[in-house]
């Protein structure tokens, strides 16, 4: 099994990195099905979209296929948020998150030689393409709609701060490894809320491959271990966080949790 730390995310499609991470977390992840389905969509797109069309026309046709004929859409009807993040489930149900829908669309677009790239906007992942004339086109991966600067500023003011401003670097191409880390963070939170603690632990372990000494990730792993009633390991992880980040406002709460676990161990013994 390849390691996430050794994988060159930026030299591979985003889907490849997501599939590798998924294989490490879910023993039942159907890698072959996902690749077969991605290839099927590429073939359908190649049949429908003429290479003689302009770049803009090809992209418009791809968006019409993806969100129209193929029916990909956002995850409003999905019962469990984690189902909107796993590529196999998104390909089956056609409902996903910005990252999962964006990754599938990027896979197809790049196979058609359309230079679509991911952007980690402060509120969600968006997609960007530059025309041959140098004009930038921004796309919302939830629905394929074009985004203008006014819409992005409204998102910033509504979600970040009423005084937030849009900067050029907000629209820079994202590092694939960073997209994967953000996806795994969201997946871990979703699995914890869904009480799928064993899977959440595997996500935490995957995230630690990027930065094995990250105190915040070690803290989260400790909290998951505590939920799984692995108190001894939980104490080790939570204590590490408190030692590394004594000034962090959440440290006081973690200290209280450490005391609760330690007291529970004394009572049990």
Curated annotation (Swiss-Prot):
Disruption of the gene: reported phenotype: Not essential for the ability to invade cultured HeLa cells (the invasive phenotype).
Signal peptide positions are none
Q: Which residues form a coiled coil?
A: none
Tell me which Pfam families the record gives. Answer: TPR_9, Transglut_core2
Entry-linked InterPro entries: SirB1_N
Tell me the protein family, please: Belongs to the UPF0162 family.
Q: What does this protein do?
A: Required for maximal expression of sirC, not required to invade host cells.
Name of this protein:
Protein SirB1
Q: Which organism is it from?
A: Salmonella typhimurium (strain LT2 / SGSC1412 / ATCC 700720)
């Amino acid at each position: 099994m390849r390691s996430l730390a050794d994988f060159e995310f930026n030299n591979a499609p985003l889907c490849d990195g997501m599939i590798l991470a998924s294989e490490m977390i879910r023993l039942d992840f159907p890698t072959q099905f996902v690749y077969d389905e991605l290839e099927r969509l590429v073939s359908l797109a190649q049949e429908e979209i003429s290479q003689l069309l302009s770049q803009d026309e090809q992209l418009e046709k791809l968006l019409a296929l993806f969100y129209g004929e193929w029916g990909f859409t956002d995850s409003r009807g999905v019962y469990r948020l984690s189902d909107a993040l796993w590529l196999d489930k998104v390909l089956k149900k056609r409902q996903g998150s910005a990252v999962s829908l964006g990754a599938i669309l990027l896979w197809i677009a790049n196979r058609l030689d359309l230079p679509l790239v991911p952007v980690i906007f402060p509120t969600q992942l968006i997609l960007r393409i530059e025309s041959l004339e140098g004009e930038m086109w921004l796309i919302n991966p939830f629905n394929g709609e074009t985004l203008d600067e006014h819409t992005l500023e409204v998102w910033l003011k509504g979600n970040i701060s009423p005084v937030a401003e849009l900067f050029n670097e907000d629209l820079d191409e994202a590092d694939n490894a960073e997209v994967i880390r953000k996806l795994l963070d969201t997946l871990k939170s979703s699995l914890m809320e869904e009480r799928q603690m064993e899977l959440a632990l595997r996500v935490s372990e995957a995230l630690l491959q990027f930065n094995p000494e990250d105190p915040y990730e070690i803290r989260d792993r400790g909290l998951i271990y505590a939920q799984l009633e692995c108190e001894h390991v939980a104490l080790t992880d939570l204590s590490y966080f408190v030692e590394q980040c004594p000034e962090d406002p959440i440290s006081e709460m973690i200290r209280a949790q450490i005391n609760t676990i330690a007291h529970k161990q004394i009572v049990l013994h």
